[in-house]
From Swiss-Prot:
This is Protein RnfH. Disulfide bonds: none annotated. NCBIfam families: PRK01777.1. It comes from Burkholderia mallei (strain NCTC 10229). InterPro entries: Mopterin_synth/thiamin_S_b (IPR016155), RnfH (IPR005346), RnfH_sf (IPR037021). The gene is rnfH. It comes from the Bacteria.
């Protein structure tokens, strides 16, 4: 008799993390593992139609197969545009007057 693959399904919020271990049939997909875990019922705020998922930090489509020991991750949408976040960090560094921040300013204003 073959053993059913065991996978973990995780979803993380800033204040709470969920990690559920489930047994899935051989040949199961990411979608099957998520459905078997019940994570979508635990977190009704997850938009199932726009689900971004991965396996061990690498993006994976919902129909990707899972293997024994995989960790299926459900990703949240970005809150801030990465370019905007970086620009805010640069502006803050410049305001604080660090050498790192000042090197991008014109020479006459350093």
């Amino acid at each position: 008799m073959t053993r059913m693959p065991k996978v973990q399904v995780c979803y993380a919020l800033p204040e709470r993390q969920t990690l559920v271990a489930v047994d899935v049939p051989a040949g199961a997909s990411v979608r099957d593992a998520i459905a078997a875990s019940g994570v979508l019922a635990l977190h009704p705020d997850i938009d199932a139609s726009a689900l971004k998922t991965g396996i061990f930090g690498k993006l994976a489509p919902l129909d990707a197969p899972v293997a024994d020991g995989d960790r299926v991750e459900i990703y949240r949408p970005l809150i801030v545009d990465p370019k905007l976040a970086r620009q805010r960090r640069v502006d803050k560094t410049r305001r604080e007057g660090s050498i790192e921040g000042r090197k991008w300013l014109p020479k006459d204003s350093r």
